[in-house]
């Protein structure tokens, strides 16, 4: 159902459009919908306000004409007469055919019911539909005769009745809807013929020109099309529950009688429209105003009655629009069909057997609009869709012919539904919008969107499940791909975590090692102080032996050397060598202590006569040992090499005041004609880093020295057998080392 907010917005837009046109001076007529104007620029009749009245108190006796397509078996029916709100239906025995034939024309000037002789009331039960069709046809003939008699009576009272007091009963859709409710069968009717909501709708009396134009248009359509037998209606019909009143001048009663004459069972009107009716239509439509009766709710009650696949329309609305002054043609959205079609996609508004009494009116337009807003009927939801409009007459055709024609029309309707263009293309330019007075309701409760979306989702899920089952049956079960990315991320995270953890551990270890080394150093310092004070050597040795990793510290060996020196003679050189092997640092302090011990004159040595000779020999042995330790330092572990303090090599060049300078020996390039020069060597002073020299043994052969490098001239004489050397000056290192350098 369309929500009230939408109709309110539509009304606001219409009001603003009308104000804008009035301000611009472009409002040529009183039409509130200028976009609905026909090609002949006919003015539109004004719409009549509507209210809602009770449903149980009123009865509709005359049905509105039905817009029809140019079908083969369905012809146009008569335009209605007046209806009074005081008329009530009466029941007759079921033998009358259980069919509603309450068409009547009131000739009373005050709009009162003409009496029992002018009305044919036939009502039966709501569930029995077994009455034969012949009885129905006879009832229809009797109904038409009664209508003709009423029109004749009203024609005689033409000159005496005032214009405002004459009422013509309007055939509304209420009767059709109540018939359909009686049978619990859906009825497809255009919005222009819908029954109003009985609780909130009353009809005001419009102007006289309206009825005049409607009668003229009715005559035009009836002259244009032939009156043939309509499809028989099956089942029982429920009485009308709604009436509408439309005033009509007495001058038009003659035309109304002509309309009634045309509805005779055997009568066939001419298929050409007389020129005087066209002129009358042009004159009457010049002053006509739009009559819009707001569309109300359409509801389907499928569970109230015994049959589960029957529906009841509880309320319906009527919308009357202006007559398009153009060629009498049907709207493309109104398709042909039969009275018993069961197509699942046929919507309720697509009534194939409805007749139209106005050429190309807005009934079909609103009908198409309602079609686009109504939900689809499912298969088996309704037994049949029977043309229950009272204006459609029953002919003498048999039931078999009716069923066959209905089935054929259902097939054509299905094909036309598939090939018909979308409804919006008809509504954009010509479909009228509802005026103020109530929201437009053209669905049966819930819009299509709210019903189709869950169905689509459910259908998609079902298809997905079926596809999975098919894959499983075919053995096409897709395995889960390996989670490579996630595992990689986990590995990276673990690596990062382990890296930072390892760094933290290293820092903690360094801190602990530093604290331990500080403690050991402090302990060894205390031991030295105790030795200087003259504490017993046994106690000091016990303390030294209890210190962990004390051998890596030079102070440990210093303490041990002093303790051994206090006791007597000992092997100082062996102690020094052992300290170097253990990686004691700093080794320079230990060297100084060892030299001091060796130079002590008070020390007594066996086999030596002079202390000076012993001191010199000890010094030379210490220097040799230092050289050996330098070459063997490369064999130590990285930690030991870092902790061990390196003692620089003492060379004569350093003693001369040029530390780090060595001599590079290179052969002289071959010179043609000078063979004696080939035996000579070039000597070039170069600077070499002590750090690189210590690590050069671990370098690959490509990075090692290609030329021979010696620390002094004495080594040069020991290494090279060449007796003649040529000194070559190094421009980057201006050192001569005592060699004569020629300026040339």
UniProtKB/Swiss-Prot annotation:
One Pfam family this sequence matches: CKAP2_C
Protein's UniProt keywords contain Nucleus: no
Post-translational modification summary for this protein: Ubiquitinated by the anaphase promoting complex/cyclosome (APC/C).
Polar residues bias locations: 76-86, 102-129, 137-154, 199-216
Compartments in which it is found: Cytoplasm, Cytoskeleton, Spindle pole
GO cellular component, one term: mitotic spindle
Membrane-crossing segments per the record: none
Region (Disordered): 35-56, 76-169, 182-216, 317-337, 428-452
Cross-link (Glycyl lysine isopeptide (Lys-Gly) (interchain with G-Cter in SUMO1)) at residue(s): 195
Keywords linked to the UniProt accession: Cytoplasm, Cytoskeleton, Isopeptide bond, Phosphoprotein, Ubl conjugation
Residue positions, PTM Phosphoserine: 744
Residues in cross-link Glycyl lysine isopeptide (Lys-Gly) (interchain with G-Cter in SUMO2): 195
KW Phosphoprotein (keyword) present: yes
Role this protein plays: Microtubule-associated protein required for mitotic spindle formation and cell-cycle progression in neural progenitor cells.
Family according to the record: Belongs to the CKAP2 family.
Note on domains (UniProt): The KEN box is required for the association with the APC/C-Cdh1 complex, ubiquitination and degradation.
Designated name of the protein: Cytoskeleton-associated protein 2-like
Protein source organism: Bos taurus (Bovine)
């Amino acid at each position: 159902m369309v929500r009230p907010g939408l109709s309110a917005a539509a009304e606001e837009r219409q009001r603003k459009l009308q104000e804008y046109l009035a301000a611009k001076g472009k409002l040529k007529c009183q039409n509130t919908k200028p976009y609905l104007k026909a090609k002949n620029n006919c003015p539109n009749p004004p719409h009549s306000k509507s209210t809602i009245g009770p449903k149980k108190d009123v009865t509709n006796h005359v049905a509105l004409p039905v817009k029809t397509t140019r079908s083969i078996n369905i012809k146009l029916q008569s335009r209605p007469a007046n209806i009074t709100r005081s008329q009530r239906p009466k029941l007759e025995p079921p033998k009358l055919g259980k069919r509603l034939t309450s068409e009547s024309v009131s000739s009373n000037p005050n709009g009162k019911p003409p009496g029992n002789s002018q009305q044919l009331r036939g009502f039966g039960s709501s569930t029995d539909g077994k009455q034969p069709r012949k009885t129905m046809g006879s009832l229809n003939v009797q109904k038409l005769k009664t209508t003709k008699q009423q029109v004749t009576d009203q024609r005689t009272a033409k000159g005496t009745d005032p214009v405002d007091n004459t009422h013509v009963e309007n055939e509304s859709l209420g009767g059709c809807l109540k018939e359909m409710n009686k049978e619990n069968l859906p009825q497809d009717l255009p919005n222009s013929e819908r029954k109003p909501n009985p609780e909130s709708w009353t009809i005001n009396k419009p102007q006289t020109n309206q009825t005049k134009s409607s009668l003229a248009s009715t005559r035009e359509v009836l002259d244009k099309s032939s009156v043939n037998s309509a499809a028989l209606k099956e089942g029982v019909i429920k009485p009308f529950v709604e009436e509408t009143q439309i005033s009509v001048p007495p001058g038009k009663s003659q035309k109304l009688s002509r309309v009634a004459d045309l509805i005779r069972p055997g009568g066939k009107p001419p298929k050409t429209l007389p020129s005087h009716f066209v002129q009358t239509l042009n004159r009457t439509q010049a002053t006509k105003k739009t009559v819009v009766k707001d569309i109300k709710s359409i509801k389907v009650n499928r569970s109230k009655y015994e049959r589960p696949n029957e529906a009841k329309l509880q309320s319906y609305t009527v919308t009357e629009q202006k007559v398009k002054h153009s060629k009498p043609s049907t709207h493309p959205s109104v398709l042909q069909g039969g009275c018993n079609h069961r197509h699942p996609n046929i919507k309720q508004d697509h009534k194939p057997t409805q007749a139209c009494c106005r050429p190309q009116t807005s009934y079909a337009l609103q009908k198409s609009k309602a079609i686009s807003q109504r939900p689809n009927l499912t298969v088996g939801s309704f037994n049949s869709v029977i043309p229950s409009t009272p204006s459609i007459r029953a002919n003498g055709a048999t039931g078999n012919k009716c069923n066959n024609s209905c089935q054929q029309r259902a097939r054509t309707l299905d094909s036309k539904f598939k090939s018909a263009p979308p409804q919006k293309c008809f509504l954009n330019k010509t479909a009228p919008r509802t005026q103020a007075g109530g929201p437009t309701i053209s669905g049966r409760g819930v819009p299509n969107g709210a019903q189709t979306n869950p169905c689509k989702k459910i259908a998609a899920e079902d298809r997905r499940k079926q596809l999975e089952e098919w894959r499983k049956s075919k053995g096409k079960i897709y395995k889960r791909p390996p989670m490579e990315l996630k595992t990689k991320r986990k590995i990276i995270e673990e690596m990062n975590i382990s890296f930072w953890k390892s760094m933290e551990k290293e820092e903690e270890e360094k801190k602990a090692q530093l604290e331990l080394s500080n403690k050991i150093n402090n302990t060894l310092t205390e031991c030295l102080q105790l030795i200087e004070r003259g504490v017993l050597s046994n106690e000091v040795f016990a303390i030294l032996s209890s210190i962990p990793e004390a051998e890596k510290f030079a102070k440990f060996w210093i303490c041990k050397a002093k303790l051994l020196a206090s006791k007597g003679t000992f092997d100082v050189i062996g102690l020094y060598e052992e300290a170097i092997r253990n990686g004691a640092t700093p080794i320079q302090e230990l060297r100084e202590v060892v030299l001091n011990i060796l130079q002590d004159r008070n020390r007594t040595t066996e086999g030596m006569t002079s202390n000076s000779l012993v001191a010199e020999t000890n010094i030379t042995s210490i220097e040799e040992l230092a050289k050996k330790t330098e070459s063997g330092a490369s064999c130590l572990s990285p930690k030991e090499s870092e902790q061990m303090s390196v003692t620089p090599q003492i060379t004569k060049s350093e003693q001369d005041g040029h530390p780090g300078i060595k001599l590079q020996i290179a052969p002289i390039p071959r010179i043609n004609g000078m063979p004696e020069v080939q035996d000579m060597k070039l000597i070039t002073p170069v600077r070499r880093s002590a750090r690189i020299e210590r690590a050069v043994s671990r370098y690959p052969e490509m990075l090692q020295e290609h030329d021979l490098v010696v620390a002094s001239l004495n080594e040069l004489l020991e290494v090279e057998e060449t007796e003649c050397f040529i000194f070559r000056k190094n421009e980057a290192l201006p050192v001569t080392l005592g060699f004569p350098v020629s300026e040339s």
